[in-house]
Amino acid sequence: LAEALAETRNSEHEVEFICARSECLPPVGVRTHIVGRPGGLKFIKMLWFLIRAEQVRKRGNYDLVISLGKTWNQDMMRVGGGPQKTFWELSEKAWPAGFSRWFKHLRRRLLPSNWLTRIIDNHQYRSGCRIICVSDAVRHWTQKAYPGIPVPEVIYNLPDLSRFTPPTPEQ
């Protein structure tokens, strides 16, 4: 997304990307802000990114902020997998009935990182930002989890078929 924006930008706007870490050089025309990622519990990593990304956003005085993750304030939000509570409802059936399902349910509700995810989700979905879902199914899950929000738009992610080849007989 950052690369596409950089290719189409005009001279009035710059493309900046706020991330916890970067594993490669940014595309031409994109400036990264690496906020770091402390070790330890997932809750600490998430909270660190939430706070640091918000600090960079405020200092940046951006015209448009697009969120691809767990950020506090944004103008547009891309939803890839749907809300956490919907994921829990759908995936709970994958666990066998009985103790293992009950224990998974309990662990999900006790983990501080899941509390933080729920808080961020609730804020993001109810913030009034424009919501873009990657499929009709994700839009349905989003509307079910957050009734009353504006209807999200759907923009499908198309695969890059040039990256895939049929398997060889040896494969």
Feature names for model-found ranges:
Residues 21-44:
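Conserved nucleotide-sugar phosphate-binding/catalytic loop shared by glycosyltransferases and other
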Residues 1-23, 60:
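N-terminal subdomain of nucleotide-sugar transferases
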Residues 55, 104-134, 150, 154:
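Membrane-proximal helix-turn-helix segments that form the acceptor-binding/catalytic region
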Residues 165-171:
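A short helix/loop element that forms part of the nucleotide-sugar donor recognition site in Leloir-type
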Residues 66-67, 73-104, 132, 153-154:
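Active-site proximal beta-strand in glycosyltransferases
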Residues 137, 158:
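Carbohydrate-associated surface elements
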Residues 11-16, 75, 130, 151:
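Residues at the starts of beta-strands that form the adenosine-phosphate
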Residues 39-65, 74, 114-123:
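An amphipathic, basic-hydrophobic alpha-helix
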